[in-house]
Curated annotation (Swiss-Prot):
SMART domains reported in the protein's UniProt record: LeuA_dimer
Alphabetical list of Gene3D superfamilies matching this protein: 1.10.238.260, 3.30.160.270, Aldolase class I
Name of the protein in its database record: 2-isopropylmalate synthase
Chief subcellular location: cytoplasm
Spans annotated as Regulatory domain: 398-520
Molecular function in Gene Ontology: 2-isopropylmalate synthase activity; acetyl-CoA C-acetyltransferase activity; manganese ion binding
Family in the record: Belongs to the alpha-IPM synthase/homocitrate synthase family. LeuA type 1 subfamily.
Amino acid sequence: MTETAASSAERVLIFDTTLRDGEQCPGATMTFEEKLAVAEMLDGMGVDIIEAGFPIASNGDFDAVAEIARRTKTSVVAGLARAISADIARAGEAVRLAKRGRIHTFVSTSPIHLAHQMRKSEEEVLEIIQKTVAQARDLVEDVEWSAMDATRTPIDYLCRCVEMAIKMGATTINLPDTVGYATPDEYRAMFRSVRERVPNADRAIFSVHCHNDLGLAIANSLAGIEGGARQVECTINGIGERAGNAALEEVVMALRTRADVLPYTTGIDTTQIMRASKLVAAATHFPVQYNKAVVGRNAFAHESGIHQDGMLKNQSTYEIMTPESVGVQKTSLVMGKHSGRAAFRSKLEELGYRLSDNQFQDAFERFKALADRKKNVYDEDIEALVDENLATAHDRIRLLSLTVIAGTRGPQRATMRLDIDGRQATEEADGNGPVDAVFNAIHALVPHEAKLELYDVHAVTEGTDAQAEVSVRLRQGERSVTARGADPDTLVASAKAYLAALNKLLAGANRLHAQHAAAE
């Protein structure tokens, strides 16, 4: 086995694919710097394998995988590759400088995929497995092979494919529920059957990779572990293709909380889970739903009088895990307009941020401006401020000023000043309401064809002076992006969110994708 082999039968490896499968979620594209920040977070919290991207997809993806491979201290860094020679060579080059690099190659195995996507016979696919796994093993010692659409593949043929992949040097075998079709009993039985029937199964670690189309991704992942898998592929916040992937935080906390019936451990520092969730939400501009398990805003909130009474008497009456175990701290009111740089830096470190000097200075200036406008500055305010600052560091369009005239009579009018690629411009626009006027002013300053698909507002903290956090989703052609903006003024937050979405569209305008998207 490779260096990532489990130290005991009970050890489960965590394979995070937020930067690859997670980023395939429509609108979730991350910048180069955001990918590096997420990878650093994953490495620091104890993720065993980071799937950093799909190197053949674009030069940007290759560069991100290569830089993550160079920087990562502990985690294995994997690059995805189709069962195509050029893909495998590109992935091998991308992870070449990693302390521990992995090539993850995949091919379809189900009858429906072979007939309609691959247009290959079973024997032809076996030959492809033989050649491509051998090529990958010549480049790296750590090779993962995946049977795409494994759960709709006849078990006899699946066993033949797995045996061939291991024979040619695969050290990890992934049997994904690609379309989220399996039930837990079926998934558990598949792993048990393959491991029992494949003669060389003991030479590889088996892996689960579950999609959430029927809401069964977590249940199936746990069932796969019970069936003998010792690696779980997952993403922060469960982002991913279609309905998403199994959420890392849910897998890890399920194993930790129910160790009485699931006697398996991971190497994850669970106290960093909330920080990772917020970082990914900020980078992808995908808000976490309020009732999301483990990391949702309401995950540890209790409104029912009966529940509150029980919590006051003993937290274990209605909490099966503590907020502190996943990094949720009690909100503190220690920051304000009189707080200096040292206190602010200490608070950032407490919240899990590590900023460069320039990033710190920008964040501190925004904090002081916020503190002048807001009586109490909560941890959540600081997190929203810093996350926005990191996400907009390389924007081509920046908001300089906004004035809105609104009321029951007369036109709703917005006057906006922007910095566009270093050039300042001002425009006025009317609208059917103040938000519409703001967005019309942006359109006048930055003409575009994008259509607004989502506009959502919620308060970051409590009180009438709470920061508003606005989410916006824009679609231009086949491309959809989501972005967020935060400010005590809802209209300013709206402008920031819309501009952040436009900046993401501009940043991704030249992004190239492989002819066939990896859809594990």
